[in-house]
Every structure is written in C-alpha cells, then in structure tokens.
Amino acid sequence: MNHSIVIGVLAALSGSLAWTLSSSLWRSIKTSLTAWQLNGLKIVIATLFLCPVLLFLPWSEQTNGLMLLMASGAIGIALGDSFYFAALRRQGTRRTLTIEALGPLLASFYGMTFLAEIINLKSWLGAILVATSVVIAAFQQPPENGVGFNRQFSSQRLGLLFALSGVICGVSGAALSRQVLLLGQITPLQSAAIRLLGGLVLIIPWLSKCAY
C-alpha cells in the first residue's frame, strides 16, 4: 500500500477518534454557554495555540490561497462546528455522529462532480450503508434515561436540521481547503491555523447575539 495512503487513513481515523472523544466530553460538561459561544471559546483557545504558525505564513506570496482557507474556516469551523454543537445538545452524541457520517458521502459526490474522481463499487456500497444508518438514526428517539435531552418532536427536528447543516458546512469548508492543499504550497498545519483564524473572524462579532 502506498505510504501516503497509509498516512491519510491513520490521520482520518485519528481525527474521527478525536471528534468522538471531544463530543462525549462536551456532552458531559454542564454549561450555560450556547453552542455558538462554546465554539467561539474553542476557536479562541485553538487559535492562540497555533498563533506562532500564523506569524510565519506566506501572506504576500499565497494571498489567494490563504483567503480561500479563511473562507473555508468561516464556513466549516465557525458555522459547521456551531451547528454540530447545537445538534449534540438536542440529539446526543450517537445520533449526531451517525448523521455526521454523511460527510464522506457528500465529499465523494463533490470529488466525482468537480474533481473528476472515480468512485468504485465498494465505495458506493459503503455510501449506501451510511445513508441507511443515517435514515435509521434520524427516526430514532433518544434513550429515556438520556440526561439533558429534549424529547419533544420540534427539538429533535431542529437537532436533525442542525446536524445536516453542520455536515454541509463541514464538507463545503473541507472542499475549499482541499483545493489549496492540492497545490502543495501550504502545509496541513498552516492550513489548520489559517482556517481557525477565518473562523475566529466570523464568530467573534456574533458571540453575544446568537442564542442557539
């Protein structure tokens, strides 16, 4: 197997594991912060952590690519993650992560449509399984002993809408960043830092105004 493919698979699995653990951790935190505010706090902390990377970015040489990455962060991190946190609050980790599994499916459609990528039979079978699991999860009710769940139909429907919006924003943001990364002039770490900055620019002005 190609070495780069192995690295890509390991990175994807590590990212999924990190998302699952962080989602469970967030569900266990008792807080009055809204999803937008919590995401803003997360972005601020992460941006400060990667601040040294931002200082050495090739701003003058890669202006277009960096602006594209900032737009990617605004869509995928500021909007997408806020929708994701809002869905977690209403539906819980299991249902939200199941719907989140639509992400690779939508990304595959994007690659096939705009990047002329070829989707093999195994990938299509996997896509069908994912779509089926999402449909099943969408019609399930949260467990009776689920702490903090709102079992009302309106809340569950809103949670489903938030989860789907999070997937769409996440895939859209990833698609924008992938166009830049394919050029090979900006490293993944630099890409993560500039995307966080883009998310920060969008989310900060609305921290006290967004109530979901």
Predicted regions and their residues:
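Membrane-interface helix termini and inter-helical loops of multi-pass transporters
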Residues: 1-3, 55-68, 116-121, 146-149, ...
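Glycine-/small-residue-enriched transmembrane alpha-helix faces in small-molecule transporters
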Residues: 1-37, 48, 149-190
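Structural signature of hydrophobic alpha-helical transmembrane segments
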Residues: 4-18, 63-77, 121-132, 187-201
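Loop-to-transmembrane-helix transition segments
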Residues: 7-15, 41, 50-54, 60-83, ...
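Hydrophobic/small/kink-forming positions within alpha-helical transmembrane segments
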Residues: 17-20, 51, 74-78, 104-109, ...
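Structural motif at transmembrane-helix junctions in multi-pass transporters
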Residues: 31-37, 82-102, 184-190
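Alpha-helical transmembrane segments of compact multi-pass small-molecule transporters, enriched
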Residues: 44-49, 99-113, 128, 198, ...
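Hydrophobic transmembrane alpha-helices of multi-pass small-molecule transport proteins
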Residues: 50, 109-115, 122-142
